[in-house]
């Protein structure tokens, strides 16, 4: 089971995005007073009392509207509700109970999901009595907050985590390697997965996942066990852009969140899109293992350097993940399809790699001897020792005299030395510099 998912639901303009930003800890959504406003990201990670969970801002639900954009937003909100473990139903304590609130409540009750009723915009203690009319929704005891002033959020979050699925934190990590296939619609994700499954003999099962997870395929090959996560269910069913475009990646984000390895599938004829970069950039931010598969390579007219030229263009577009390997395939003809899982396994192995402290310090000592740190602010960085503190992605802590004397170019040099000494193909590595007195 992945992290719990909490959907923030309510009619327009009740303060959902303001609350979303408070819980996410940073401003990552544009907040305006116009119903249906476009927002940049609706999916973020949050934490409360050692409970890590995912929050989704569903946008405003207007049950009776015939507007095509609003109707599409309503359908996407319903999808988020299906995915959610807990629903936060936000209402406006200043405006009071409205017929639209009753319509939303009716829809939420049908979901049979745990619902926490939150009365927002209670900015002063004398406004607390405004919550009582919301008992008429039949959802239970309301919790009052002021999202803009961050009042009452602790009590609200206590109620949220109380409703998380029992035992989700107790499950041991299983031995499956989870691989998410992401990319634009019609790029060939399903075809590639079907080809991989068709070429392997030891398929355990091929079952429909929950509404949250699209379709998971379970595969055993030799000593390895894989879960192939297909996000092919993502289809933008409308040509309408702006407001609804942001919803097209919700399930992809959920798949990335569960994955160890993320495969970005690119159509060789169409190239990479801004949406591709946003999606794989999110996986990079979460420190997932990454690789790029260029599909439909059979359709490209080729010269001697076509592949290298194409790869260089992609690497330029995806410069933030220079560590990712590339493979050019045709899911239709089967060209190089058999190598996709091999490369994903290699990325996962490097993603999970642990280096002994002794070997690590030998490499860094030699690196410092070859090139001393530059003098910064009249002082020179001195590295006492380094140790690896985590895997998935490999994380290294350098104990130094003064982290402020670290120049960004020397940090890049140290990372390059680690990559030259150890194979970290397919995975980012994290480096932290902490002060330690000599």
Swiss-Prot record:
Q: Which residues bind GTP 1?
A: 10-17, 57-61, 120-123
Which organism does this sequence originate in?
Answer: Clostridium tetani (strain Massachusetts / E88)
Q: Which UniProt keywords apply?
A: GTP-binding, Nucleotide-binding, Repeat, Ribosome biogenesis
Tell me which residues make up the EngA-type G domain.
4-168, 177-352
Q: Which GO terms describe its biological process?
A: ribosome biogenesis
Q: Which Pfam families match?
A: KH_dom-like (PF14714), MMR_HSR1 (PF01926)
Function description:
GTPase that plays an essential role in the late steps of ribosome biogenesis.
> Which cysteine pairs are joined by S-S bonds?
none
Residues involved in GTP 2 binding: 183-190, 230-234, 295-298
The protein here is known as: GTPase Der
Which PROSITE patterns does its entry note? G_ENGA
The Swiss-Prot or TrEMBL record describes its family as follows:
Belongs to the TRAFAC class TrmE-Era-EngA-EngB-Septin-like GTPase superfamily. EngA (Der) GTPase family.
Q: How does it assemble?
A: Associates with the 50S ribosomal subunit.
Q: Which domain of life is it from?
A: Bacteria
Where in the numbering of this chain does the KH-like domain appear? 353-437
Q: Which residues cross the membrane?
A: none
The taxonomic lineage of its organism, from the top, reads: Bacteria, Bacillati, Bacillota, Clostridia, Eubacteriales
Nucleotide-binding is among the record's keywords: yes
Gene Ontology terms, MF aspect = ATP hydrolysis activity; GTP binding; ribosome binding
């Amino acid at each position: 089971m992945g992290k719990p998912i909490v959907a923030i639901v309510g009619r327009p303009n009740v303060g959902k995005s303001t609350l979303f930003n408070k819980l996410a800890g940073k401003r990552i959504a544009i907040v305006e007073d116009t119903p249906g406003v476009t927002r940049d990201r609706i999916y973020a990670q949050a934490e409360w009392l050692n409970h890590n969970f995912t929050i989704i801002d569903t946008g405003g639900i207007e049950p009776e509207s015939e507007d095509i954009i609003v109707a599409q937003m309503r359908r996407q909100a319903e999808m988020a509700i299906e995915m959610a473990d807990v629903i936060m139903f936000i209402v406006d304590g200043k405006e009071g109970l409205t017929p639209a609130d009753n319509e939303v409540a009716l829809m939420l009750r049908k979901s049979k999901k745990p619902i926490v009723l939150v009365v927002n915009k209670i900015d002063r203690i004398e406004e607390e009595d405004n919550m009582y009319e919301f008992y008429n929704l039949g959802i239970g005891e309301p919790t009052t907050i002021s999202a803009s002033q961050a009042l009452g959020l602790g009590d609200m979050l206590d109620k949220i985590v109380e409703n998380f699925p029992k035992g989700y934190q107790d499950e041991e990590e299983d031995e499956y390697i989870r691989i998410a296939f992401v990319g634009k619609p019609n790029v060939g994700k399903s075809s590639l997965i079907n080809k991989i499954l068709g070429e392997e003999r030891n398929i355990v099962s091929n079952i429909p996942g929950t509404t949250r997870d699209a379709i998971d395929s379970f595969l055993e090959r030799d000593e390895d066990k894989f879960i192939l996560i297909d996000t092919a269910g993502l289809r933008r069913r409308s040509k309408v852009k702006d407001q609804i475009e942001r919803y097209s990646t919700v399930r992809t984000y959920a798949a990335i969140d569960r994955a160890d390895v993320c495969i970005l599938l690119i159509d060789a004829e169409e190239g990479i899109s801004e949406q591709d970069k946003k999606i794989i950039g999110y996986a990079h931010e979460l420190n997932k293992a990454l690789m790029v598969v260029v599909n439909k390579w059979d359709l490209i007219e080729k010269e001697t350097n076509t592949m290298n030229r194409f790869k260089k263009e992609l690497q330029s577009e995806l410069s933030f993940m220079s560590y990712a390997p590339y493979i050019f395939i045709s899911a239709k003809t089967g060209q190089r399809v058999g190598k996709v899982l091999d490369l994903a396994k290699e990325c996962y192995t490097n993603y999970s790699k642990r280096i002994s402290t002794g070997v690590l310090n030998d490499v860094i000592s030699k690196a410092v001897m070859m090139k001393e740190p530059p003098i910064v602010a009249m002082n020179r960085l001195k590295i006492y020792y380094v140790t690896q503190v985590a895997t998935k992605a490999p994380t290294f802590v350098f104990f130094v005299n003064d982290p402020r004397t670290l120049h960004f170019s020397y940090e890049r040099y140290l990372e390059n030395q680690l990559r030259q000494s150890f194979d970290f193909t397919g995975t980012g590595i994290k480096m932290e510099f902490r002060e330690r007195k000599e």
